[in-house]
Amino acid sequence: MAINRSITPTPELSVAAAQLVRVADEGSARHAHLVALLDGSGPHAARDLCDAVHLLCSLHGRYPGLMQIALQRCGNGLARDWLNKASEAFERERLYLVRLTAAVGPLPSTPGAAETEASLMSARNALETLANSERDGCALGAATALVCDWWPVRRLLDRAAARVGTEPPAPSLPDEASVLEVVDGATQTPGSARALAFGGEQLLLQHRALFDLLEARAEARADY
């Protein structure tokens, strides 16, 4: 089960730097199941990879997603400019994910389908809540965490694409420097800094929970 943790900015660690540390420490790249999927050496690697693509699409393949909702609710300024670019870039990632989901074949038969769908619905609702949050900084925290945490996810998608002969698009998400700039520029109060941290933590929590679910489904299929 995913555990919610907190990283607090210090005089030596800015709000933006704390966000990057948060993603590095709590993000998908450190999850054992993602590491195993990228390694791809197990006897059921292809099936597990297919399952991961399908569940990622269930979480992030719908429109509008977190980025678009956050952009719609954001006022003018630095955060809106960044979200506009991030939203356009993530839409390309979403379309890639949808196309790849069709290419990898059907969702692997796995016990506990109803429980899986309930977990995914809860995760989608959580992301929508973050994107719609009225707390200044919360949606931006979730959006910047999503962009930063997408890179290990993108490596997973590209591995699946290589298996089925699908050409991946060139990555176009905002880089780390732009994340630092927008977080530093948009969090001018302690309240907005706390809200940004909360949004980031909750996004990463949902990603870890997704890989927990994928790991449990892989184990269930092994006994099926």
Language-model regions, residue ranges each:
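Accessory, usually C-terminal, subdomains that scaffold auxiliary metal cofactors
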Residues: 174-197
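Acidic, low-complexity proline/glycine-rich segments
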Residues: 2-36, 115-118
